[in-house]
Regions:
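Short secondary-structure boundary/capping segments
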Residues: 22-23, 98-100, 156
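Conserved catalytic scaffold of divalent metal-dependent phosphoesterases
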Residues: 104-157
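Metal-dependent catalytic neighborhoods of phosphoester/phosphodiester hydrolases
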Residues: 18, 51-69, 85-104, 108-110, ...
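A structural signal for isolated positions on well-ordered beta-strands in alpha/beta enzyme cores
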Residues: 46, 80-82, 139-141
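Short helix-terminating capping/connector loops at secondary-structure junctions
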Residues: 76-79, 135
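Short, solvent-exposed loop/turn segments at secondary-structure junctions
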Residues: 13, 89, 145-148
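N-terminal active-site segment of His-dependent metallophosphoesterases
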Residues: 1-70, 77-78
Length: 157
């Protein structure tokens, strides 16, 4: 059985380039990507970091992402979306909305987590990819950008 992934990264939603908004270009890209999803019906869409251009993105940039996820789910309800935080993203912000994104078959990994015995919580990072019959057909290790505080443990709550 073939597994079909779309792998993207570095969307930088909300970016201004020399004081000019790139929102229109982002809209064009997302429209194109939705058309590809509609035509090819991949098993998973992987968004590998730098979803937003800044750690605190404008509400318009967040709305653009969430509208895209809703539209993509409508076109390919079986498709899973896996998003990981990049160095421009807030890992906590990306994970914060995950309960809402589950409706759209989307999963986020923004930060690494540690078990009580100080070992890496691999379960948080390892994501199964399913076919339309909900059989596991692949695994994805979703490793976000690691900030030094996350590695040393100084970032614990």
């Amino acid at each position: 059985m073939a597994v079909h992934f779309f792998h993207t990264s570095d969307w930088h939603l909300g970016q201004f380039f020399y004081n000019h908004s790139r929102q229109y270009k982002h809209e064009q890209f997302l429209t194109w990507l939705l058309e590809q999803i509609k035509q090819k019906q991949p098993n998973a869409l992987l968004i590998a970091g730098d979803i937003f251009d800044v750690i605190n993105p404008a509400s318009a940039a967040q709305k653009q992402l969430y509208q895209f996820l809703a539209d993509a789910h409508a076109l390919a309800p079986h498709m899973q979306t896996l998003m990981i935080a990049g160095n421009h993203d807030s890992g906590y912000r990306i994970e914060q909305v995950e309960p809402l994104l589950e409706k759209y078959n989307a999963k986020t990994v923004g930060v690494i987590r540690w078990n009580e015995d100080k070992s890496l919580d691999i379960e948080h990072l390892l994501q199964p990819i399913y076919d339309v019959d909900q059989n596991i057909i692949a695994w994805c290790l979703s490793l976000p950008f690691l900030r030094s505080a996350e590695i040393t443990g100084f970032n614990e709550h």
